[in-house]
């Protein structure tokens, strides 16, 4: 059976001066889905604790919209057939991401770091780190607009302000976010810990 080539591969093989960008977990105002909502929502709800599966160690490389734009500008000035990874200069863990968001919003909470995935699921929960090699982009002259903590502020503030209206924020029953915001299960866990002490 013949293998079907992906659209980026087909574009690259034409020899035309087309640059294909491969970002990872995109963040920025208007991001869909806005993954950082799992922590922003907790702050808005004044949750006393943040639960993180795999002890928050999961790393799935983030990509700021501002960094994508910076790479597009460089690639457009030097047209050639190529495929470039696009990612932030750092690759924060889920724990680091939660801390960046809480700090920006002036919120403090207890960190409940769990070894399993029964609670504390989040969008960066991967067994093995996913980190993109951006050396080709850097060799082209690309300079990131900023690291994760610097660039994610735009999305955080956008979410706190209500996005672009009610429909731009995740619905409480959204299948992507609902498992990450199971407050009833978390409260039960915290209550059990208090009674066993």
Regions inferred by a protein language model and the residue ranges of each:
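Glycine-rich Rossmann NAD(P)(H)-binding loop
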Residues: 28, 52-58, 84-92, 124-125, ...
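N-terminal Rossmann-like NAD(P)+-binding domain of SDR-like oxidoreductases, especially those catalyzing
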Residues: 1
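A short C-terminal helix-loop "cap" of Rossmann-like NAD(P)-dependent dehydrogenase/epimerase domains
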Residues: 40-53, 107-112
């Amino acid at each position: 059976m013949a293998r079907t080539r992906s659209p980026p591969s087909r574009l690259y093989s034409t020899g035309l001066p087309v640059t294909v960008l491969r970002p990872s977990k995109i963040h920025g105002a208007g991001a869909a889905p806005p993954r950082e909502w799992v922590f922003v929502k907790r702050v808005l709800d004044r949750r006393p604790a943040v639960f993180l599966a795999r002890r928050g160690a999961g790393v799935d490389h983030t990509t700021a919209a501002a960094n994508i734009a910076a790479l597009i500008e460089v690639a457009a000035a030097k047209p050639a057939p190529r495929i470039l990874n696009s990612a932030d200069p750092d690759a924060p863990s889920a724990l680091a991401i939660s801390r960046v968001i809480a700090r920006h919003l002036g919120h403090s909470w207890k960190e409940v770091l769990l070894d399993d995935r029964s609670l504390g699921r989040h969008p960066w929960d991967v067994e093995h780190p996913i980190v993109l090699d951006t050396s080709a982009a850097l060799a082209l002259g690309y300079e990131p607009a900023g690291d994760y903590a610097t660039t994610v502020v735009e999305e955080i503030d956008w979410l706190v302000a209500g996005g672009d209206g009610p429909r731009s924020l995740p619905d409480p029953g959204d299948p992507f976010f609902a498992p990450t915001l199971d407050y009833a299960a978390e409260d039960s866990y915290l209550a059990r810990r208090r009674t066993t002490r």
